[in-house]
Regions:
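N-proximal low-complexity "stem/linker" segments adjacent to membrane-targeting elements
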Residues: 1-28
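Short alpha-helix within the catalytic core of nucleotide-sugar-dependent glycosyltransferases
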Residues: 27-28, 144-154
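Short, acidic, metal-binding catalytic loop of nucleotide-sugar glycosyltransferases
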Residues: 28-49
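A short beta-strand-loop structural module common to alpha/beta enzyme folds
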Residues: 44-60
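Active-site-proximal specificity loops/subdomain of glycosyltransferases
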Residues: 55-127
């Protein structure tokens, strides 16, 4: 039986966020990677159900690989209906992109993550259950076709990633995983989604640099 549910299903929520970009080229690969529904859970032996939640933008930002982030251009698209048809998500929002609303480097990333996780949480509350695993993913990613998303047991209070892990050189070399993919139990992902509220507070206190998104905290704030 699932840890949080009484319907004898292991429930996975895949929360897509960020720009769609080359979503058409990656959709088949992504659905195969996450679709474990035809197999029982490897440890629990119960059916697996995977639901999608999508927050994305009506605009894609493009730049050449070796150019800086300040040398890019925006293109609007009308792919929302097609994305919905392919993924058949529980909830989808294609939001109007307003650059002035997100002046700093990570603003839109944290915002979109928070919105996708809020969709997931609203669905849980409405239907009185909780997902066993919640995944933060992107619409423009290609995964190794030899693998599928791992359904091993995960622990409370821990977030996992299968992508590159870097270090924060100015934060005691703590681990930092990127925005491609990470996952955790549902309450942990809700906490991570709330990073946007904290980041927004720091913005309003003029503690986040506009150009590079770095945070400048005074000693008395620790």
């Amino acid at each position: 039986m699932s840890l949080y549910n009484n319907d004898k299903k292991f429930r996975v929520a895949v929360c897509f966020s960020g720009q769609a970009r080359h979503w058409q080229a990656s959709a088949g690969n992504i659905k195969r990677f996450f679709n474990n529904d035809e197999y029982p859970h490897p440890e629990l032996g119960i059916p697996v159900q995977t639901d999608y939640f999508i927050h994305t933008w009506d605009t894609n930002t493009w730049r050449y690989p070796k150019t800086g982030h300040d040398h890019s251009h925006n293109e609007r698209h009308n792919d929302g209906a097609a994305i919905k048809e392919v993924y058949k998500p529980v909830t989808i929002e294609v939001e109007n992109w307003i650059p002035e609303k997100f002046p700093r480097s990570w603003d839109s990333m944290f915002y979109s993550l928070a919105k996708s996780l809020l969709m997931k949480r609203n669905h849980e509350l409405k239907n009185q259950f909780q997902y066993d695993i919640v995944v933060k993913a992107r619409l423009d990613t290609i995964y190794n076709p030899a693998h599928r998303f791992p359904l091993f047991r995960i622990w409370p209070g821990i977030a996992y990633t299968s992508t590159a892990i870097s270090k924060f050189p100015t934060e005691f070399n703590y681990n930092n995983f990127d925005d491609v993919l990470f996952y955790a139990q549902s309450p942990v992902m809700d906490l991570l989604g709330d990073l946007y509220s904290t980041y927004k507070y720091l913005h309003n206190a003029d503690l986040v640099a506009v150009n590079d998104g770095s945070i400048d905290l005074q000693p008395d704030m620790y």
